[in-house]
Design a protein with these regions (language model features):
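Phosphodiester-processing cores and adjacent nucleic acid-binding clamps
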Residues: 1-184
Length: 184
């Protein structure tokens, strides 16, 4: 069963082009039986959960947090894990997440480190029973040990044509005038 692991929706303000209703429709059309969202807040979780359940899709609830400038993606295993995600999300609205926060709210969570954050693996391994390093390309995979390795690529749009709008979205987020956004 294929389930994309790192999907951000437009609930991660000015980071993604994906609307939950479009994501559900895409999953239905492509016979995807499980979906995850990994926004940087928990705002869209109920809408996502209800839409998945109404369409016979298994919802996987995740949260992207930042610690020491590195991204960490956490997934709830059950309701206790979900509550821990809510606590971490709340903390992240007030201040930066610390290692101590993660040690307090680590139970019933799966931790996947995006490739650029794999340096945190040894620091976080004692906290998580299920912790994985990720890669996006074959070249990246070759640089990592084979233990606890998963493929994970951040998904920020559904339709390829929407990718051209992302630099403008990010520019707005960074306070850059649209006319000054550099598009590659």
């Amino acid at each position: 069963m294929y389930a994309p692991l790192y999907i951000k929706t437009n609930n991660s303000l000015l980071e993604s082009m994906i609307k939950i209703e479009d994501l559900i429709e895409y999953a239905k059309v492509n016979s995807i039986k499980a979906l995850t969202i990994t926004d940087n807040r928990m705002y869209g979780v109920m809408e996502f959960y209800k839409a998945c359940m109404a369409n016979d899709i298994k919802p996987i609830i995740g949260l992207e947090i930042t610690m020491d400038g590195s991204k960490i993606v956490l997934y709830a295993k059950n309701i206790k894990g979900y509550k821990n995600l809510i606590k971490l999300s709340t903390i992240s609205t007030e201040r930066t997440i610390t290692l101590e926060d993660l040690s307090i709210y680590n139970s019933d969570l799966v931790c996947i480190l995006p490739y650029d954050s794999n340096n945190l693996y040894d620091t976080l391994k004692p906290l998580y029973e299920d912790i994985f390093k990720s890669y996006r390309t074959v070249k990246e995979r070759e640089t990592l040990s084979k233990d606890n390795l998963v493929y994970m690529n951040e998904t920020l749009y559904i339709d390829k044509k929407d990718s051209e709008y992302l630099p403008y979205l990010w520019g707005i987020k960074d306070g850059i005038m649209v006319s000054n956004v550099k598009v590659e």
